[in-house]
Amino acid sequence: ALVGKNSEKNNQNLMQLIRRAHGLVENPDLEKHRQSQDHIGELLGNSKEIQYRPVDIDGMDAEWVSVNRAHMKKYVILHCHGGGYSTGSSIYARTLTSKLAAGTSMDVLCFDYRLAPEHPYPAALEDAVAAYQWLIGEKHYEADKIVIAGDSAGGGLALALVMYLRDHGMDLPAGVLVMSPWTDLTNSGKSYQTNFNRDPQFGGTTDNMLFHSTYIGDADPENPYISPLFGSFEQFPPILFQVGSEEVLLDDTLRVAEKVRKTHGKLRVTVYEGMFHVFQMALRLIPESREAWDEVSHFLEIIYCIERKKEGKTVKRVKSGRERSRREP
């Protein structure tokens, strides 16, 4: 589905601000880049209604994000942060994790997986598996009460994690939510060319993490655990894909979605016209971002069969046979 187009003039300043803030094209010092991202997360994720609690997962830092009000503690979202596998953290991800928690009334766990180039593949995937197993083994969540989410590289990691769980006979989550996922580290999609001069973040230059990934290391970039595009999506839980029409990563979403359709899997794909990479970080500043967050909340309500009353309370709804037969949530 295509969703409305906000004028380029209205978005131009915001796009340039985000581009400069993240240092995506300027290729700054890596450690300074990581530190500046944490500062952004601390600033933009500052909210009185959100509580951030540090968590240790067998030596791996993580952050538990929850709202300071009554919420649904039986459900949890496992969020894989973005950053090209070489930057990003749970603090940087607060812009998204705080909104996930506030908009869904669910707890969110974001973990600090090891970063490249210090730790190439399979470090991030190993840490994602560890975080998922920790939720089940230590926090005693049932797998069907977990949704795996991710943005950008974290979106690709979320899909790779579900592949790994399926391939190793582990219980699968209730659903997957990915924003602008990086699913093809070979950069083979047509949108890498067609949107090259349109993407306000990654376009116009090859001097950025998309074209110089240090995560691959000595591995095959077509390994599905690195580039989920090249894997199988059989037996996947329902997936929500959100992507902007201007992204060089557009085909990373569309090509994966087509593979999911061929398996008769349940999915929803929304292309937000005129939007840039992980535009959801704009929160309520632009209408497309507001609509995307509303879609996220609705998707999770469908996944968990929840009806939300006007006063904010939730009730569990029983699926009918007709509803169980629907392909698309």
Predicted regions located by residue number:
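Alpha/beta-hydrolase superfamily serine-hydrolase fold, recognizing
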Residues: L17-L24, G45, Q51-P329
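N-terminal membrane-anchoring alpha-helices
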Residues: A1-K9
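An N-terminal hydrophobic leader/cap segment in hydrolases
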Residues: E8-P54
